[in-house]
Amino acid sequence: MSNKVHLGHTARKRFGQNFLTDDSIISRIVGAISPDNDHVMVEIGPGLGAITEPVAMSIDKLSVVELDRDLVERLQNHPTLKDKLDIHQGDALQFDFSTLQQAGKKMKVFGNLPYNISTPLMFHLFEFAEIIETMHFMLQKEVVLRLSASPGCKAYGRLTVMAQYYCQVVPVLEVPPHSFTPAPKVDSAVVRLLPYANKPWPCKDVTVLRHLCTTAFNMRRKTLRNNLKQLISDEEFGLLNIDASLRPEQISVEQYVALANLLCDKQ
């Protein structure tokens, strides 16, 4: 049998499917997620149910979002899971997670995310941060390093700034390739994202912050002065005590928010 086949299902490359099969890793992830009935529990990409089953068995109801029709059908016919699941067949990148809201409950969102969509999916989920209590995701280790990076690190970038604007970022554990079928060609890691109830550095318009970060990091080897010359003058950098000769990865999330708020005030 091909190493791409697990439990009779062939992993689809276009969906970025790698199925978690290591029981000890699964147990640690479920422990980190801490499923309960006080939150709306939501899984993105349940796949063949490695994490789905232990989570669903410990709560009343689990909402799942799955794109692959074959996997949706398996879940709908699963002998023990079918009555526990609220199944949504569709693309998580387009899904309106606010439709899963319940009165008085925030969400706990988790998943073994397809690596080919993990970054755009993060940006999509940040839009729902106010209704989410925790997020736990299996990601490419490189993405976790980017999410948790500090200023001055090579991994620090647009994703870092936006993630840390919305959330506290906590790496949880590293997962080797042999924990999956088929084994991915990269190392993986689990990250915990805790959306802030009160953001430490509130931005007047997050759209402006996103645009600022995209522009600043577009050419990483150039200075802030060069990259942002159409937006911010040397005098304005000086007002905020930001050195315009620094590169984009050398200033903090707080400083990016200060620059964005300056731009908001100019509009």
UniProtKB/Swiss-Prot annotation:
SUPFAM superfamilies: S-adenosyl-L-methionine-dependent methyltransferases (SSF53335)
EC code: 2.1.1.182
Keywords assigned: Cytoplasm, Methyltransferase, RNA-binding, rRNA processing, S-adenosyl-L-methionine, Transferase
Subcellular compartments: Cytoplasm
One GO CC term on file: cytosol
Gene Ontology molecular-function annotations: 16S rRNA (adenine(1518)-N(6)/adenine(1519)-N(6))-dimethyltransferase activity; RNA binding
Pfam family, one: RrnaAD
Sequence positions that bind S-adenosyl-L-methionine: 18, 20, 45, 66, 91, 112
Catalysed transformations (reactions): adenosine(1518)/adenosine(1519) in 16S rRNA + 4 S-adenosyl-L-methionine = N(6)-dimethyladenosine(1518)/N(6)-dimethyladenosine(1519) in 16S rRNA + 4 S-adenosyl-L-homocysteine + 4 H(+)
InterPro entries associated with the record: KsgA/Erm, rRNA_Ade_diMease-like_C, rRNA_Ade_Mease_Trfase_CS, rRNA_Ade_methylase_Trfase_N, rRNA_adenine_dimethylase, SAM-dependent_MTases_sf
NCBIfam families linked to this entry: ksgA
Function: Specifically dimethylates two adjacent adenosines (A1518 and A1519) in the loop of a conserved hairpin near the 3'-end of 16S rRNA in the 30S particle. May play a critical role in biogenesis of 30S subunits.
PANTHER family named in the record: DIMETHYLADENOSINE TRANSFERASE (PTHR11727), DIMETHYLADENOSINE TRANSFERASE-RELATED (PTHR11727:SF7)
Family: Belongs to the class I-like SAM-binding methyltransferase superfamily. rRNA adenine N(6)-methyltransferase family. RsmA subfamily.
Name used for this protein in its record: Ribosomal RNA small subunit methyltransferase A
